[in-house]
Every structure is written in structure tokens, then in C-alpha cells.
């Protein structure tokens, strides 16, 4: 399993750490590398799933998925019902507060 770019990073953050690419450009590049390396799965932000799907034809895992609009520390997160991924990683949206109610809310949102 490979990782494209952390959901807590945006274009500005990439520049600060020395990348001269946009998030989308870096994700596309890393998707090509993952395909060449014959990885079984690739992790990417909800906003880059469509970019990755065009290049990488295997499983896509998507963190930064939220129930509702709260983003916590994620800069590139999205509501679960809008994500076209094979696997969704949903953390604090479920674990903070009443877990049973949050899971029911998640199921209803899908």
C-alpha cells in the first residue's frame, strides 16, 4: 500500500517543505509510481480519487472522510457520501461522542 499525499497538507504546505508541485500534480506523479511499482492499493485524499482512478487501476483507500462538515485537522476532507473510493477511513467523526449514534448518522448519510 502506498500513500500519495497526506490529507493534512495543501499546496502551501508542499511549497514550505520544498515541493514545487501542486497537490494534484504530486498525486498524479505518485500514482504513476505506484502503478509502476505494482502496488495493490493506494491511499489518497477524497479530492484526488478521480485523478488516481485515471492512472492507478487497483484499490483506492481514502482517509479524511467525515460525517457532516467538520474537518478537524484535515485540510482536504470530504463527506462520506461524496467519495468514490473502494475503502473509506473514518475516524474522529465516529469515535468522538456517541459512537452508536455517529455510525447510524454515517449510514443514513450514504
Predicted regions and their residues:
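Conserved anion-binding
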Residues: 1-41, 45-49, 57-61, 67-72
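Short secondary-structure boundary/hinge segments and terminal tails
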Residues: 11, 52, 97-99
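Electropositive phosphate-/nucleotide-binding environments in soluble metabolic enzymes
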Residues: 21-28, 46, 77, 96-100, ...
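Catalytic-site microenvironment of enzymes
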Residues: 33, 101-110
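Conserved, mostly hydrophobic/aromatic
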Residues: 34, 52, 91, 106
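Short acidic active-site motifs
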Residues: 48-51, 79
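Short, structured coil segments at secondary-structure junctions
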Residues: 55-56, 84
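Glycine-rich phosphate-binding active-site loops on the catalytic face of alpha/beta enzymes
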Residues: 65-103
